[in-house]
């Protein structure tokens, strides 16, 4: 089964607290390990929560310090492991300038290539079995959200139809299920569409980054299996949310409702809500009727395949 598992490395906004690290999210997507943001202390959190260090790519939502300064130490740790495979770093405009500085801080030279890529709204990074889409969002500086969208899976295999067509059980069944045609002994060709149902949609994971509620995010999160949305503030901090271009928990929930997202996880909490996020949860649940949770450091979510 193709794995899609999230581990929250840091769930605090702006500054670390005793209980919450700065922003970082590890996503195990199929055989890949991805990071979305890498705040200070992220590598220690990866050790603590057992994600491993075999990271293929890092996607930065923006370049406020609390979202990317952890990459400096993380790259050096990767070098000490003897890594030789390249790592890909993605982010909004200014990524090349800022991340080039991060790569070259310190005396040690990298033992592996570091490839830096700048993204804009609508750009797509293809991966094996899925793609990561960049979504322009509304923050104080250039910022992106991300939608991880799996390829559709083949439809269900109709065993009775396959048998009626004379397909022998065994490897031929597997080939058809993988989308490959099979030639029978009598010369007939059985195509995958002859024995498979309609394609089954892949999963969709959407990560807001720091943002005000915005139409682009609603569009990206349409029918998402999971929306991870920042919820820095509560209702009584609405003015502060607008001023700093962040979201309240209620606003995050409204995005989830308007998008028809299947599940909502709130993260990036102000220190005011560090140990007691119950107000955020209550306000979100008043706006959105689907499952909603407040993330904490070490919180893990595994998304099941769609039927």
Curated annotation (Swiss-Prot):
The keyword Hydrolase applies. The active site is at 66 (proton acceptor). Binds 2 Zn(2+) ions. Keywords: Endonuclease, Hydrolase, Metal-binding, Nuclease, tRNA processing, Zinc. It catalyses: Endonucleolytic cleavage of RNA, removing extra 3' nucleotides from tRNA precursor, generating 3' termini of tRNAs. A 3'-hydroxy group is left at the tRNA terminus and a 5'-phosphoryl group is left at the trailer molecule. It holds the Pfam family Lactamase_B. Zn(2+) 1 binds at residues 62, 64, 139, 210. Zn(2+) 2 binds at residues 66-67, 210, 268. Its cofactor is Zn(2+). It is an enzyme of class 3 (hydrolase). One of its GO terms (molecular function) is 3'-tRNA processing endoribonuclease activity. Its EC number is 3.1.26.11. Belongs to the RNase Z family. Homodimer. Zinc phosphodiesterase, which displays some tRNA 3'-processing endonuclease activity. Probably involved in tRNA maturation, by removing a 3'-trailer from precursor tRNA. This is Ribonuclease Z. It comes from Myxococcus xanthus (strain DK1622).
